[in-house]
Amino acid sequence: MAKKVQAYVKLQVAAGMANPSPPVGPALGQQGVNIMEFCKAFNARTESLEKGLPIPVVITVYADRSFTFITKTPPAAVLLKKAAGIKSGSGKPNKDKVGKVTLEQVRQIAETKAADMTGSSIETKMKSIAGTARSMGLVVEE
């Protein structure tokens, strides 16, 4: 028989840097999960990624206090900021442009995020990423 799911916990944790301090500790402690066990497993799974990159993770907590987790790709905004070489997006994206990204960079980001995005073709995913870039005050160059 399948295990009974107690809760789903969604967090963003820096790759390779999970530790029992907030936000990880309180969120998992509330569910009665062994926090250090999660931290070790998460850090092991994300050691190949760039250290400090925020990684969305969905933790499934079962009634017997065991857990499984799924890591996703970093948010598009984080990848766009990295590609454009900026610290943060524009406060007024329609007026103040803070950087530029090329269509090739948008394609690479869309391919990276392909598994986590909806849309059938890479072109539709590129349009979505380009829209995110524009809403951050980035100019998408051909």
Swiss-Prot record:
It holds the Pfam family Ribosomal_L11. Disulfide bonds: none annotated. One of its GO terms (molecular function) is large ribosomal subunit rRNA binding. The keyword Ribonucleoprotein applies. One of its GO terms (cellular component) is cytosolic large ribosomal subunit. Keywords: Methylation, Ribonucleoprotein, Ribosomal protein, RNA-binding, rRNA-binding. Forms part of the ribosomal stalk which helps the ribosome interact with GTP-bound translation factors. Belongs to the universal ribosomal protein uL11 family. This is Large ribosomal subunit protein uL11. It comes from Pasteurella multocida (strain Pm70).
